[in-house]
């Protein structure tokens, strides 16, 4: 079967078909079970991070090196010609002349699509503002499949900052293709955006609003936690919600045995350390899967056959 991702930009989950997502998922699982060190041999990848990152940057660079490729780039846009006023379009033009693919993170929504428009090589979006984070979504899909044995018709609860969290937006857009059911737990001011719930409606996916993490843990197959950012509230408002969206081990007492708790990390207070010792915690394994997910993306984008 032809590789449906060869020479493709990876910008948004919405751009990818279910067939392409399944190809990425199965390739990630295959590379995890049977690693290969030759798929990027002779390839040079540009790692262009205009804002700080730990897991995403390091796991992408690990993926490149494990596949036999090499990396050039930067980890902070302040030390590039962007600081002098160079446009993103020009940066993409220049770096695409040096490399076989560009991995880009940028603070502005839509920046990845701008880079793709002017790049001569595939652009992989490593996060653009509050918009999209497709490689995170792929590692989430790998983790969900790994823990549940399927993606079809799962119950997915999402908690915390659902308004600004690009990870939960992208994950909803991916899992709607498998007819999953969703539940949302958040402060009213950080509710899931209308455009996401409208997409779920159009796909025929059911969703509900729940009032507590205990309810979510009892209902769900996957509980996807995110951080409620203190800086988005005044002190009085934050005091009202503080702790309400922080998960503790005692809240998992009525959870189904197959429930797994995921988090894009870094966590602060929203998952208590006592959850780490429960059989439901899976966020560190989730982070490890980032390497295999990104190996799959790079392998498929840069090889006709994998």
From Swiss-Prot:
Carbamoyl phosphate binds at residues 55-56, 105, 133, 136, 265-266. Keywords: Pyrimidine biosynthesis, Transferase. Pathway: Pyrimidine metabolism; UMP biosynthesis via de novo pathway; (S)-dihydroorotate from bicarbonate: step 2/3. Its EC number is 2.1.3.2. L-aspartate binds at residues 84, 166, 227. InterPro entries: Asp/Orn_carbamoyltranf_P-bd, Asp/Orn_carbamoylTrfase, Asp/Orn_carbamoylTrfase_sf, Asp_carbamoyltransf, Asp_carbamoyltransf_Asp/Orn-bd. PROSITE patterns: CARBAMOYLTRANSFERASE. GO terms for biological process: 'de novo' pyrimidine nucleobase biosynthetic process; 'de novo' UMP biosynthetic process; amino acid metabolic process. GO terms for molecular function: amino acid binding; aspartate carbamoyltransferase activity. GO terms for cellular component: cytosol. It comes from the Bacteria. Catalyzes the condensation of carbamoyl phosphate and aspartate to form carbamoyl aspartate and inorganic phosphate, the committed step in the de novo pyrimidine nucleotide biosynthesis pathway. Heterododecamer (2C3:3R2) of six catalytic PyrB chains organized as two trimers (C3), and six regulatory PyrI chains organized as three dimers (R2). Belongs to the aspartate/ornithine carbamoyltransferase superfamily. ATCase family. This is Aspartate carbamoyltransferase catalytic subunit. The gene is pyrB.
């Amino acid at each position: 079967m032809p590789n449906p991702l060869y020479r493709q930009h990876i910008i948004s989950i919405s751009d990818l078909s279910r067939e392409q997502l399944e190809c990425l998922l199965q390739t990630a699982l295959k590379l995890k079970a049977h690693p290969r060190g030759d798929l990027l041999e002779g390839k040079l990848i540009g790692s262009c991070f205009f804002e700080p990152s730990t897991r995403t940057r390091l796991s992408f660079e690990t993926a490149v090196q494990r596949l036999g490729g090499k990396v050039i780039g930067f980890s902070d846009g302040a030390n590039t010609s962007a600081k002098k006023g160079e446009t993103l379009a020009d940066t993409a033009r220049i770096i695409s002349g040096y490399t076989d693919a560009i991995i880009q993170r940028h603070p502005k929504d839509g920046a990845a699509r701008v880079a793709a428009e002017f790049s001569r090589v595939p652009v992989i979006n490593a996060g653009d503002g509050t918009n999209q984070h497709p490689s995170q979504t792929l590692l989430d899909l790998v983790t969900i499949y790994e823990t549940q044995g399927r993606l079809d018709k799962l119950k997915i609860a999402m908690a915390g900052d659902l308004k600004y969290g690009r990870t939960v937006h992208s994950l909803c857009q991916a899992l709607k293709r498998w007819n999953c059911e969703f539940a949302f737990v958040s402060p009213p001011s950080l509710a899931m955006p209308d455009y996401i719930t409208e997409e779920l409606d159009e796909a025929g996916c059911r969703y509900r609003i729940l009032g507590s993490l205990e309810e979510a843990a009892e209902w769900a197959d996957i509980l996807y936690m995110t951080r409620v950012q203190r800086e988005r509230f005044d002190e009085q408002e934050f005091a009202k919600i503080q702790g309400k969206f922080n998960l503790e081990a005692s809240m998992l007492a009525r959870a189904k045995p197959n429930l797994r708790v995921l988090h894009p990390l870094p966590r602060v207070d929203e998952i208590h350390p006592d959850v780490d010792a429960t059989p439901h915690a899976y966020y560190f394994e989730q982070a490890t899967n980032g390497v295999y997910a990104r190996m799959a993306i790079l392998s498929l984008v840069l090889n006709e056959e994998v």
